[in-house]
């Protein structure tokens, strides 16, 4: 009998050595005392946890003796945290405070369609933007959207365009945080002005056809509203480095301060992008920045400030090539055309799809600068001393908007945004006599190879062309590389 007692004692010893306990309690609203059903309670550093029931109670079983930290969280409330020493069953109650004005949920001043509106629309989430957009222009993520076609055109950074139901960008209202971005003169949208907006995009809604927009914008084709990231409740940041063909290099850095003194929060993103381009001469040299700030004046009264911009310059590829030069698919398509010149097929059938006529080499002895009208300067160094771009785009058009959200009562809310968008920049092109290098005489598209620019020839001709009708000694240029400059400022207030 004595031996049996010893065996039983040894058998049950682990139960006493590893006693299991229960932590229980309630999760309630700190101001009203109401139960917070569904609140999560977690033992930090373990897989143990529980969800609060309808009456706000929770229970976590099989907790070994020891010291632990418990956290409780639920959407719309600030997280709670408590420490507890467990040597038996313990009770831990949480009283959570409402999050200060839900700073992480930016209310956008924009006309967005909902489930019950008779508008065809598609929403693109931030997760989709991060997974599918990469370093492309914003419109490219909409290519899988019904009735939408987007293309990068010649491949230059920011040179994309979008068509909705057959209408081009002049008939599509493009907005950032509810602020219209179409050109005031011709309605076009220059995506190079927003080259880095994809890195700060929270969501995109594409409305197809006439929609709920109550602004004077050209929206017969549709409405595209880009929503940027709000200020974040939690402190943190991220760093991203991207590499690609054509010497592509893109660096992105982001930082959020989190909520400071339950009153304010700041977020900032900066992007640097460079590369020689996939197409010949389609280099890019760009920066992008995004800044957000939010301040809680009082309950139901909030101010937000946002600024976004993308100072950039890039080479363009704007000339169409003979269809047979577009690789195997181009040759196949050309052969299917009854009126296509077969002689051209023989000349262009082995064309280099990466060829671009918007640039050409120039002698290193040429020291001319490029005309430039940005940041108070009139001239700037060329991107590369070994070549000249006929077509180059440069611009910086920041957007700054101040949002005010005011809850008048339970049935009325007032949203007001004051904004400014402006800047300067332009693009290059040629005037006067052309200096080209066709392989043989003939039409430029039917030479044995596409023509190229002869910049050295143009410089020589301009340097030895005394025109006595204008001046007895000075040379008169036969052809010039011009820069067209655009300066604009747009102010506005939207309230509803």
Question: Which sequence ranges carry the predicted segments?
Answer:
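Short, acidic Ser/Thr/Gly-rich low-complexity loop/linker segments typical of extracellular
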Residues: 46-57
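Short, acidic, small-residue-rich periplasmic hinge/interaction motif at the N-terminus
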Residues: 28, 32, 39-44, 73-77, ...
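A beta-strand signature from Gram-negative outer-membrane beta-barrel systems
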Residues: 195-240
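Extracytoplasmic beta-strand/coil segments of soluble accessory domains associated
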Residues: 139-180, 202
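Structural signature of outer-membrane beta-barrel domains
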Residues: 113-115, 169, 181, 229, ...
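Acidic/polar loop-and-plug regions of large Gram-negative outer-membrane beta-barrel proteins
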Residues: 302-401, 428-486
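Transmembrane beta-barrel wall of Gram-negative outer-membrane proteins
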Residues: 236, 243-274, 279-317, 324-362, ...
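Short acidic/polar hinge/loop motifs at secondary-structure boundaries
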Residues: 61-62, 131, 161, 180-208, ...
């Amino acid at each position: 009998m004595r031996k049996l007692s010893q065996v039983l004692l040894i058998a049950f010893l682990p139960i006493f050595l590893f006693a299991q306990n229960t932590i229980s309690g309630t999760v309630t609203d700190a101001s009203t005392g109401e139960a917070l059903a569904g609140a999560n309670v977690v033992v930090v550093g373990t897989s143990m946890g529980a969800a609060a029931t309808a009456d706000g109670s929770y229970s976590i079983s099989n907790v070994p003796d020891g010291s632990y930290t418990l956290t409780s969280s639920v959407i719309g409330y600030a997280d709670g945290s408590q420490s507890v020493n467990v040597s038996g069953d313990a009770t831990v109650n949480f009283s959570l405070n409402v999050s200060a004005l839900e700073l992480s949920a930016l209310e956008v001043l924009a006309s967005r369609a909902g489930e019950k509106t008779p508008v065809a629309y598609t929403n693109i989430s931030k997760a989709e933007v991060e997974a599918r957009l990469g370093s492309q222009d914003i419109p490219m993520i909409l290519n899988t959207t019904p009735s939408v076609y987007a293309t990068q055109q010649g491949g230059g950074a920011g040179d994309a365009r979008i068509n909705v139901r057959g209408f081009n960008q002049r008939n599509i209202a493009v907005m950032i945080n509810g602020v219209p971005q179409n050109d005031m003169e011709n309605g076009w949208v220059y995506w190079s002005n927003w080259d880095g907006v994809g890195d700060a995009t929270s969501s995109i809604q594409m409305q197809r056809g006439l929609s709920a927009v109550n602004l004077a914008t050209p929206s017969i084709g549709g409405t595209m509203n880009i929503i940027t990231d709000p200020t974040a409740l939690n402190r943190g940041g991220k760093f991203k480095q991207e590499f690609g063909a054509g010497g592509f290099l893109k660096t992105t850095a982001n930082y959020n301060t989190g909520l400071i003194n339950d009153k304010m929060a700041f977020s900032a993103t900066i992007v640097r992008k460079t590369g020689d381009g996939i197409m010949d001469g389609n280099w890019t040299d760009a920066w992008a920045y995004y800044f957000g700030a939010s301040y809680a004046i009082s309950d139901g009264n909030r101010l937000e400030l946002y600024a976004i911009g993308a100072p950039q310059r890039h080479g363009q590829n704007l000339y169409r090539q003979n269809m047979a030069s577009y690789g195997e698919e181009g040759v196949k398509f050309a052969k299917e055309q009854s009126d296509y010149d077969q002689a051209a097929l023989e000349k262009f059938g082995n064309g280099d799809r990466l060829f671009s006529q918007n640039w050409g080499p120039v002698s290193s002895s040429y020291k001319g600068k490029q005309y430039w009208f940005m940041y108070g300067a009139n001239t700037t160094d060329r991107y590369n001393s070994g070549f000249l771009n006929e077509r180059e785009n440069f611009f910086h058009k920041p957007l700054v908007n101040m949002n005010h959200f005011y809850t008048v009562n339970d049935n009325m809310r007032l949203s007001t945004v004051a904004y400014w968008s402006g800047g300067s920049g332009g693009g290059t092109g040629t005037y006067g006599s052309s200096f080209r290098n066709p392989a043989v005489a003939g039409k430029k598209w039917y030479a044995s190879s596409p023509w190229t620019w002869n910049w050295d020839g143009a410089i020589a001709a301009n340097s030895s062309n005394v025109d006595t009708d204008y001046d007895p000694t000075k040379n008169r240029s036969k052809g010039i590389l011009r820069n067209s400059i655009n300066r604009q400022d747009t102010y506005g207030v939207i309230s509803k």
